[in-house]
Amino acid sequence: MRILLSNDDGVHAPGIQTLAKALREFADVQVVAPDRNRSGASNSLTLESSLRTFTFDNGDIAVQMGTPTDCVYLGVNALMRPRPDIVVSGINAGPNLGDDVIYSGTVAAAMEGRHLGFPALAVSLDGHQHYETAAAVTCSILRALRREPLRTGRILNINVPDLPLDQIKGIRVTRCGSRHPADQVIPQQDPRGNTLYWIGPPGGKCDAGPDTDFAAVDEGYVSVTPLHVDLTAYSAHDVVSDWLDSVGVDAQW
């Protein structure tokens, strides 16, 4: 199994290094990751400047100023030969649950892998301690995929409780929960009196029902949420069509 491994926390982050070590016990792994923390980069792609890479002695590749999406794009199309069998992103330091997925560079890296035609996993730890637990869970899932491929055409967004492995209760297939909109902005002043702004914390949970990713992780279960790239709201087609007919927008051109 050939694995392209990326993340959004940066090439030296403990999550990706712990996972790379575990994966190399049974797979051919190429790390291509940002040279610094790019959390919250979502699906951004660098188009207005060139990208430089640096290869470390162990073969890991850092993309200077690159986003997670840049890293997977370069990894698949230029840096990993032969191409990978699967793209894995993580282990993220902190969860990617509910609405977090729309901002997450971790999920975006997996999404880019799927967009380019490869199976893809995004893996996050609900904390900053038990990376070995998340690595063990990921390795188990990948070994299962090697034995019996999962042909859904979907990204698997995996969130692991920050617990020792023997305290994990099991695994659940979940849906994304949701949060209240975030509204906090934290202003500060620099030494010259200029105002600086920090984005505040995420909103609180507003949908954390029993079938959500929030609930699974809170209860000690690994959450596996299938995600897809198509954002079309098919259920709204008729509503939007009827509205356009009723208001006559095209009659005003």
From Swiss-Prot:
GO molecular function: 3'-nucleotidase activity; 5'-nucleotidase activity; exopolyphosphatase activity; metal ion binding; nucleotide binding
Binding site for a divalent metal cation: 8-9, 39, 92
Catalytic activity: a ribonucleoside 5'-phosphate + H2O = a ribonucleoside + phosphate; a ribonucleoside 3'-phosphate + H2O = a ribonucleoside + phosphate; [phosphate](n) + H2O = [phosphate](n-1) + phosphate + H(+)
Main location: cytoplasm
E.C. number: 3.1.3.5, 3.1.3.6, 3.6.1.11
Keywords, alphabetical: Cytoplasm, Hydrolase, Metal-binding, Nucleotide-binding
InterPro entries: SurE, SurE-like_Pase/nucleotidase, SurE-like_sf
Stretch forming the signal peptide: none
Gene Ontology CC: one annotated term: cytoplasm
Keyword match Cytoplasm: yes
Superkingdom of source: Bacteria
Cofactor note: Binds 1 divalent metal cation per subunit.
Localization annotation: Cytoplasm
Cofactors: a divalent metal cation
Sequence similarity: Belongs to the SurE nucleotidase family.
Task performed by this protein: Nucleotidase with a broad substrate specificity as it can dephosphorylate various ribo- and deoxyribonucleoside 5'-monophosphates and ribonucleoside 3'-monophosphates with highest affinity to 3'-AMP. Also hydrolyzes polyphosphate (exopolyphosphatase activity) with the preference for short-chain-length substrates (P20-25). Might be involved in the regulation of dNTP and NTP pools, and in the turnover of 3'-mononucleotides produced by numerous intracellular RNases (T1, T2, and F) during the degradation of various RNAs.
Protein name: 5'/3'-nucleotidase SurE
Species the sequence originates in: Citrobacter koseri (strain ATCC BAA-895 / CDC 4225-83 / SGSC4696)
